[in-house]
Design a protein with these regions (language model features):
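Phosphate-binding P-loop
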Residues: 12-19, 94-96
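Short glycine-/polar-rich loops that comprise or flank the Walker A/P-loop
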Residues: 19, 97, 123-128, 174-179
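Glycine-rich phosphate-binding loop used to anchor ATP phosphates in small-molecule kinases
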Residues: 78-127
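Conserved phosphate-donor/acceptor-positioning beta-strand/loop module used by diverse small-molecule
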Residues: 123-142
Length: 199
């Protein structure tokens, strides 16, 4: 497992084997969607996964936009469950269909990582993690900027899980992943491309 530390000024391209599942994860508001928008030209109003250069780009906003008109009457926890289930199903379908996938995920729940790793193995490929590591204050500011704020108790749980996840990654102790790259905001800003032509 490779762990690339944050603040690496030369880290401009990330390269993975063809057909890999790359999961971009971080705290809510960390800037995951912003990074995908910049790298793949997403507008933010898509309702389905986007094909870009032979890669399926899957952001949870796509599932949220797909369901939006029908979810308004439902309570927030149920809306979140429906969107998350749809998002995970789309990731699994694309990976099992043999596509290279870059997917957005909050990913702080271990069972999600193990589940995605299992799906990748079924497809004969690997799970690779890109951790966008920002402090909670920056993530909270990102939530305010996008107009969707996670409730304080839930966000605190995210933060606890996130700290544990990053600590495990830096220690090389994330067995479900074939590789792990940790980026802070400046390093993410230098990233030019995520490629699927390595070995």
């Amino acid at each position: 497992m490779a762990v690339t530390p944050a603040c690496t000024p030369s880290l401009e391209d990330l390269t993975y084997p063809p057909g890999s599942l790359v999961v971009l994860t971080g705290l809510p508001g960390a800037g995951k969607s912003t990074l995908l928008d910049r790298l793949y030209g997403l507008r933010g109003d898509e309702t389905r996964p986007v094909s870009a250069g032979g890669v399926r780009v899957i952001d949870s906003r796509q599932s949220r936009s797909w369901w939006a008109p029908r979810l308004d009457p439902l309570p927030a926890p149920l809306r979140t469950l429906v969107v998350h289930a749809t998002h995970m199903a789309r990731i699994c379908r694309a990976v099992l269909g043999g596509h290279a996938v870059i997917a957005h995920s909050r990913g702080t729940w271990p069972h999600i990582l193990y589940g995605l790793a299992a799906v990748a193995r079924l497809a004969g490929t690997g799970l690779h993690l890109v951790l966008l590591d920002v402090d909670p204050e920056a993530a909270r500011a990102g939530q305010l900027a996008r107009g969707r704020v996670v409730a304080a108790p839930l966000f605190a749980r995210h933060c606890r899980r996130w700290r544990a996840l990053v600590a495990r990654a830096r220690a090389g102790a994330l067995p479900p992943a074939a590789s792990v790259t940790v980026l802070d905001r400046p390093a993410a800003g230098l990233l030019r491309a995520i490629r699927f032509d390595g070995r």
